[in-house]
Amino acid sequence: MILRHLEGIGTIKKFGFKFVLFFLIASPIIASETTISERPDFENLVKDKKLERFLISLSVTDDGKIEGSAAGRDVSGDWNWIDGYFCRTLMWGERELKYNCQKVTFDGRRLRFISDRGAGQSASFALR
């Protein structure tokens, strides 16, 4: 009984060590999100790409337009870069979404838009 208990502790320690090792190795990769603060950097990322997530596909063009679809409805809008933030107006079908300036980050694969100048909710999009 005691031997089984000690074997269980050894298994937990091995698992714990592997778990900690994984996060020590993976954390620089996970933490490599960069804030995009300049319009040309943003434009270079989205040029000729679609921003996609479940049921959403958008194009953001360098002439300040947003076009695409979300949940079966057309999406259209305008955007500009103001004081380091992506600021947009947006129509989703017949519904107007309020004007919002968003912080944008990039992790090497996905763009993340954080509403209310980085203080609100976020949505991540794959670039394809």
What are these regions (language model features)?
Residues 16-27:
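Bacterial N-terminal signal peptides
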Residues 10-12, 29-128:
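Lipid interaction determinants
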Residues 1-14:
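N-terminal secretory signal peptides that target proteins for export/translocation
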